[in-house]
Amino acid sequence: MKALILVGGYGTRLRPLTLTQPKPLVEFANKPMMLHQMEALAAVGVDTVVLAVSYRAEQLEAEMTVHADRLGVKLIFSLEEEPLGTAGPLALARKHLEDDDPFFVLNSDVICDFPFKQMVEFHKQHGKEGTIAVTKVEEPSKYGVVVFKEDGKIDDFVEKPQEYVGNKINAGLYIFNSAILDRIPLKPTSIEKEIFPQMATSGNLYAYVLPGFWMDVGQPKDFLKGMSLFLNHVQTTRTGALATGSNIHGTATIRGSVLVDPSATVGENCVIGPDVVIGPRVQIEGGVRIQHSTILSDSTVGNYSWVSGSIIGRECHIGSWVRMENVCVLGDDVVVKDEVYLNEASVLPHKVIAVNVPSKDIIM
């Protein structure tokens, strides 16, 4: 089988993390976000992945080719000269997708359990042109709702309904037969607004209800929530602790779901967790408290600092007695001096912060 991943554009909602790398390469639970998808695709026999790319294509190719070779997956890069929406990239990559097999299409910023095997079985069972994965949400009035019958046949799409019509939304994971390519022109086209309604009207589109967790990692708060859902899922489905290794000091306390890369070090009397990811070669010095946060690769957190609900980019240095909270996001190579307080601060890469940021601000 083949798959096409819609890589998208600049990832502006996840800045400053995406100012130095494309969004699919941002580390999520110590792997590039896209690698979670590629590993799940390879596990169900996908041998060719087409990446519909536009922003920092060379950087994406350099890193993902290494992972694809390890997985035994052929990567094809389909470069958009101009934005083509969510359907146009399929037309652009048509020559790579035209065969008898159904193929996957994924939004690159979706994190879930990726039940691709079950999706394929469901798609073959109903025998129609397309399958959309849908997921349950608590506040359907904020989204476009998918209305479908008990057997999955989609009747309608209702955008931000004022009255209750259902609580399932498009989860950004699809399976299509190659016949869909005849519906899509090579121009900017929305698959959700222009192609799916056509398919539903002709009875060719079905909904597969995702089990388990799901998150569209759009903004930093979504990143952190998705990380929590992911860690709790892994904790309940995997035997053994997530945070293990000789580099965690014996006096350190691990609380709840915590993922520590084996190459990272955690100092004495630290309290780590819940919902924390510590990346490769990260150094956490003594007495540090971290919760609901992720520390990306090659960063350092100094003695007795407090980090809560925050994302620290790659190669950052956090001084001693620093306090960061309320969705602080540091780009790569940021230095925070000792005893600085950051509250809901977004700091662009390569900055040095020596004064407090007591309220929401962007440090350029």
UniProtKB/Swiss-Prot annotation:
Transmembrane spans: none
Residue positions binding Mg(2+): 109, 216
Listed Gene3D superfamilies: Hexapeptide repeat proteins, Spore Coat Polysaccharide Biosynthesis Protein SpsA, Chain A
GO biological process, one term: protein glycosylation
Active site (UniProt): 160
Activity control: Enzyme activity is reduced by incorporation into the GMPPA-GMPPB mannose-1-phosphate guanylyltransferase complex. Allosterically inhibited, when part of the GMPPA-GMPPB complex, by GDP-alpha-D-mannose binding to GMPPA.
Notes on the domains: The N-terminal substrate-binding domain adopts a Rossman-like fold and has a binding pocket for GTP or GDP-alpha-D-mannose. Substrate binding is coordinated by an Mg(2+) ion.
Annotated protein name in UniProt: Mannose-1-phosphate guanylyltransferase catalytic subunit beta
